[in-house]
């Protein structure tokens, strides 16, 4: 323990003179000497109650003694017979425990987080103890409040602010909201009361018991102004009244207050759960809510003005970089993202900071500095208040209290403490300004740049009007831009936009127009952005996102200019605008092997039993990942092969999650097939064909899937609703198809085509592995064996995967007559061309026409089926590029031809990706890709036409 500083050692002599009889300087420990010198509150208390000092000297306070508060208070209230004795015992108990906490805090016997916890538990214990005693007393007098069904109704108390967050300071008032569940009347008393009357009287008596000063002091100053309608509203509200208020009139600052709200006492009963469920949507919005930024700025501005008005200097709570700014920083993330990130819904600041770090919402160093600063400031605040049990956050001006604080904070002197404090508050202020900033107007340069565009936006210029800021555009482009602006304004007149929405739009549009019209393709870009804006003008939070984050606006303009597909996706699903905030992730897709893990974490935010939210979350995750892949594609950071790799890995992660969800639902209903009891896995596999099987998915590709199982004929499920095992797998596959195809507000997940299964659409949706093998060996057509070349298991346990791989290898390595195979493959290609060929004779269909992608695929498939019995290694891969490599490595095709076909294939696929980004069909002018087409046609003739 740090020895007392010189000023405090001198002050000790004053303390000695006030010590109670029986206590001498030599009889006191160093710890007692330190605490009594530091805290006048502790000194006054032990003078009034000398036994407390003896108790502290013999048994120091413990970190976990808050667990005993309720039991100790129950003993103290055992003999209470009226309100007066209740008030006396509550005050006595509070003072005794506060002295113990001051002792532990001053001597650093427990850490600062635990001190906050002890202070909060003490308050909750006193509130609940007083409520329960008074509730019983009121019931004896007026009867028990009941609903119409006769069910007793409790008084629920919401602890707000630091009390709710478990972070109460030493000398704090307490913010409470009172509620009761249902209307009704009291029963069993001397007179009947309406429930509203009963709970109002109970609330009034509770406030008096805690708040009214007596000769013993008070327990806590009680502040009820956070309740609906504040001081002018009812003291206690029913659940229905609370719900109506927060749905219809709840204000931003009430959302912030409600973040920390916690029900006092036993809060896991049905009434408590109902109240929490009712309040949660008000506090944590399902969508990303950027209106928080401006609202917190406004609140901070009000506080700053109050600090100036009241001359509050050296205020460690409200000043720049103080406790309130740390709270604001944390609340920004809670209120913007808390609806989608349950880890941000903690009432306490420090766990929420941990969640912010885990979600990478702030740099690690910033989070570390905020944590250290918060604990430093909270310790300083508590020590300051414990000197006189006084509610203050203003640093002292007198030398004695400055010396006390310097010693308590383990600084050598006051200047050193001020220096440390200044550093911490500067760190907080920096993060606060970067995140929230001051509510200041644009800089003069920004104002000068945006002002003429404000005129363009607000003055509704005609097509033939001239304005200097559009002079750089060609006449036709200028007319198009003005027409688009005019049409957009007309469209807005049809939309129910509130005052806040119009205000934000008027702030946003000058900046947007300035950026868009600086581009050569201004008209095209604006034509893609205005439909998006028209779709979000009634959802102000998205406008605020673009207004608050210029970087997001810049990326929006760039991506919409590059791709109408992206513009359409953003317009259809505005939730994706959130992805524009972080260019570090926007242009860096998830690592290919990390999609499953990221999706798993994403789905943890959604209750497993909530199917609707699960479906929505799957679709939102997919759309966000597609946007990131497309952005990287546009930026040139992903080559064509990598684009398809990412799209394929994403699809596999989705399949994994959908099967998991379907399996969970089926097992809950029927149990699992009994043959799985003695083995690992699920006896189920999903096989991907076509582009999925070949690692070649495009942006809008559907999924070609078949489903396999290995369930014996006579197996039943082991659940209460027993069904045949094979019927279980059929229903599982049907459930999977349903989960993929169900249309939610975020669309469908994927189009799934299961027609490549044995016997096609006429066959069973799910097939046993044995039946699949038999079909492939005895009934399948050559084109089905071609399809098998590009097939692989995308979900399945190892046993079934191995079974499928064996069947595939066996079929592909079967010896075939070369001439017959050549004829069958060629005839199938001709049928496809006749059925799917290009209807635009003056255009080249990149996929279907001669010399296109399908020809390359057929060449590869033919050669594998033709030569795999001689070269089994040809069966290793299912994608065309690596098959071409294998053909060269095994001497089937010369290396030059294989390389040339690979280049042609990737070039044509790259073009298809880019056409998809432009929302264009997959055909180009006949003159395009003539070199690649000639090469493919020559290879086709060599392998599939030559005699």
UniProtKB/Swiss-Prot annotation:
Q: Please give the residue ranges the record annotates as the region Adenylyl transferase.
A: 450-947
Tell me which GO cellular component terms the UniProt record holds. Answer: cytosol
Q: What is its EC number?
A: 2.7.7.89, 2.7.7.42
Reading the lineage from the top rank, the first entry is Bacteria
**A GO term for molecular function:** ATP binding
Cysteine pairs forming cystine bridges in this chain are none
Q: Which reaction does it catalyse?
A: [glutamine synthetase]-O(4)-(5'-adenylyl)-L-tyrosine + phosphate = [glutamine synthetase]-L-tyrosine + ADP; [glutamine synthetase]-L-tyrosine + ATP = [glutamine synthetase]-O(4)-(5'-adenylyl)-L-tyrosine + diphosphate
Task: Tell me which UniProt keywords the record has, alphabetically.
Answer: ATP-binding, Magnesium, Multifunctional enzyme, Nucleotide-binding, Nucleotidyltransferase, Transferase
Q: Where is this region: Adenylyl removase?
A: 1-440
What InterPro entries does its record include?
A: GlnE, GlnE_rpt_dom, NT_sf, PII_UdlTrfase/GS_AdlTrfase
Recorded hits in HAMAP family, A to Z, give: GlnE
Q: What is this protein called?
A: Bifunctional glutamine synthetase adenylyltransferase/adenylyl-removing enzyme
The source organism is: Salmonella gallinarum (strain 287/91 / NCTC 13346)
Name the gene. glnE
